[in-house]
Curated annotation (Swiss-Prot):
One of its GO terms (biological process) is translation. Component of the mitochondrial ribosome large subunit (39S) which comprises a 16S rRNA and about 50 distinct proteins. Its main location: mitochondrion. It comes from Drosophila pseudoobscura pseudoobscura (Fruit fly). The gene is mRpL51. GO terms for cellular component: mitochondrial large ribosomal subunit. This is Large ribosomal subunit protein mL51.
Length: 174
């Protein structure tokens, strides 16, 4: 737009000069004068309102939360834990069974809360699912849970395709 306003100003000057009248000062169409407030005027206006309409939802009355009457909330009463409760006393009981216990007992044999197809498995998701399918296909699992069985089959098929397409294999020994 500046080229348009400059062109109009030039045309006006040319017409005014050719008419013989006094030339008027150039009027800028894009610039407007803004008067800056002095420091005293800004202070007189009061504080600048920022984030209008935002309400702080936190306590602003001190470090600890306060009640409406201004008193601090009391510290909770200290109740020591019972170190000899069953849960705490037996925590980690099988951690060193292979060092301290019988040589013939492997730590995998003491994993009681782990499903049989997952006990002692090391491998990626595809290998774990293949092992699960091999162990569960002869049981009632496919009939009792057909949706989960189908989802597992679909996941195995997807992983098979993905691993064959996207992963590198080593050099062939042939």
């Amino acid at each position: 737009m500046s080229w348009l306003s400059n062109t109009i100003q030039k045309l006006c000057r040319v017409t005014l000069l050719s008419a013989g009248s006094n030339p008027l000062p150039a009027i800028s169409a894009t610039s407007t004068t803004v008067r800056q407030l002095s420091h005293a005027e800004r202070r007189a206006r009061g504080p600048t309102v920022r984030r209008y309409g935002y309400k702080d939802k936190i306590f602003k009355s001190g470090l600890l939360p306060h009640l409406d009457n201004g008193q601090k909330l009391p510290m909770p009463v200290y109740r020591p834990k019972n170190p000899w409760s069953e849960k705490r006393a037996l925590f980690g009981q099988n951690d060193y069974i292979d060092i301290l216990g019988n040589d013939r007992l492997h730590p995998v044999r003491v994993m009681y809360s782990v499903p049989s197809w997952l006990r002692g498995v090391s491998g990626n998701e595809y290998q774990v699912l293949l092992r699960k399918r091999r162990l569960l296909e002869k049981s009632k699992y496919p009939i009792a849970r057909p949706t989960k069985w189908r989802d597992m089959q679909k996941r195995i098929l997807y992983l098979y395709k993905f691993l064959n397409r996207k992963t590198k294999t080593g050099y062939s020994k042939q």
